[in-house]
């Protein structure tokens, strides 16, 4: 069987690249996978967005017909993560407990409460504006302004709760990395020459990989996130943009995930996302479209923490001096935005091949890279299986 395995290079070591590798290595077909990336789990760089994510399952996709495929990806990921935490899929001791699985994977079930300050598509009566209300477990409309056991944000006009899955993202990335290497993936830490466009990048990736493995390359998966702008056509590159985020990591794990939107300007959002098993929680945040600033905005930092205090979003974490949060770190990251949504498809030029190998793109997932990861990766597997 090994002799018939098709060799796939995956360019990119973030959530999309790692999950694509895992999906290829666990599908019914035989694939040989090489992960080629500048950064892998454990690295710290603003160019490496995945470890900087807040990390919980909450679909950002609306009801438009054009987003049906992304809705399916998100639903598939929720299903897979639930099975993983329930011990129904994945590698692990058959006697391991839920707590063991949380520690190993970095995933964990948490109740999530979402609040809105303005009416919109998502605040339709009975939750009809949220396509995923029948996908998640425990979905319930909250009666505002009073709820059973907590006071909602002062300006909230609509709220829900459901069983979400929160992510200790550094641990989850390490888990995926260990799984794909256990299953036989090779990893090469190197940067590809992007000075000659797509042809040059594919050619250089092949050169790097074939230097230590002479087996022929069947396909390359471009899972480079925002870095794809350096190798795709000018027209395609113009569709890619950063969505800057800034978050604060604080001590303690919040009891639940909380989100509050539409309470201020278009850029400000408030969320609290515990990182299961880490003893820490992410507090955010913002969505600053087109902002490439790397430095921490101290004013925004203060606003993030003040909003969390004012709206009572994480009272159990106010264990610092004067009832404040105990800050561990502050981080800035660029979500990989793309006009038109994620691009998961075979290359449109040259009949789908570049320098003699099939090229499949998988980038542009914006702030939905984690919740779409399994479904998106399985779409890549489907594309490759049809070649």
Where would I find each of the regions flagged by the language model?
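Glycine-rich FAD pyrophosphate-binding loop
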Residues: 26-49
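Beta1/beta-strand and adjacent pyrophosphate-binding region of the FAD-binding site
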Residues: 2-16
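Flavin-dependent oxidoreductases
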Residues: 19, 48, 198-303, 315-320
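C-terminal catalytic lobe of FAD-dependent flavoproteins
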Residues: 142-153, 318-387
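Helical element adjacent to the flavin cofactor pocket in flavoenzyme catalytic cores
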Residues: 152, 156-219, 223, 232
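Dinucleotide-binding Rossmann-like beta1-alpha1 core, especially the glycine-rich loop
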Residues: 53-151
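Conserved Rossmann-like nucleotide-cofactor binding loop
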Residues: 16, 41, 227
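Short beta-strand to alpha-helix junction loop
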Residues: 65-80, 159-175, 295-300, 373
């Amino acid at each position: 069987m090994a002799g018939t395995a098709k060799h796939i290079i995956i360019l990119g070591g973030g959530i999309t690249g790692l999950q694509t590798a895992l999906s290829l290595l666990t599908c019914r077909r035989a694939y040989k996978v090489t992960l080629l990336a500048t950064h892998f789990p454990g690295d710290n760089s603003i160019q490496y967005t995945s470890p900087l994510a807040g990390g919980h399952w909450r679909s950002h996709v609306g009801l438009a017909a054009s987003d049906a495929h992304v809705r399916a990806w998100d639903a598939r990921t929720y299903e897979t993560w639930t099975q993983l935490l329930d011990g129904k899929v994945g590698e692990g001791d058959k006697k391991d407990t839920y707590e063991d699985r949380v520690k190993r994977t970095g995933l964990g079930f948490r109740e999530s409460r979402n609040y809105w300050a303005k009416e919109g598509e998502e605040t339709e009566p009975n939750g009809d504006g949220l396509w995923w209300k029948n996908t998640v477990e425990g979905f319930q409309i909250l009666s505002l302004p009073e709820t059973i056991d907590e006071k909602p944000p002062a300006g909230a006009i609509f709220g829900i709760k459901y069983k979400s899955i929160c992510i200790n993202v550094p641990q989850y990335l390490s888990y995926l990395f260990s799984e794909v290497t256990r299953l036989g993936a090779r990893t090469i830490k190197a940067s590809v020459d992007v000075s000659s466009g797509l042809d040059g990048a594919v050619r250089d990736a092949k050169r790097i990989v074939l230097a230590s493995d002479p087996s022929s390359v069947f396909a390359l998966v471009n899972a480079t996130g925002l870095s794809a702008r350096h190798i795709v056509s000018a027209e395609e590159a113009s569709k890619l943009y950063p969505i800057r985020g800034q978050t604060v990591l604080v001590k303690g794990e919040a009891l639940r995930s909380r989100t509050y939107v539409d309470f201020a300007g278009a850029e400000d959002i408030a969320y609290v996302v515990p990182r299961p098993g880490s003893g820490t929680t992410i507090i955010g945040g913002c969505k600053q479209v087109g902002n490439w600033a790397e430095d921490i905005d101290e004013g925004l930092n203060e606003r993030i923490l003040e909003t969390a205090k004012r709206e009572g979003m994480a009272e159990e974490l106010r264990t610092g001096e004067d009832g404040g949060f105990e800050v561990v770190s502050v981080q800035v990251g660029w979500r990989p935005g793309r006009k038109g949504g994620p691009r998961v498809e075979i290359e449109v030029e040259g009949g789908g091949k570049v320098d003699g190998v099939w090229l499949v793109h998988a980038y542009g997932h914006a702030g939905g890279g984690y919740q779409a990861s399994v479904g998106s990766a399985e779409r890549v597997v489907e594309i490759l299986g049809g070649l």
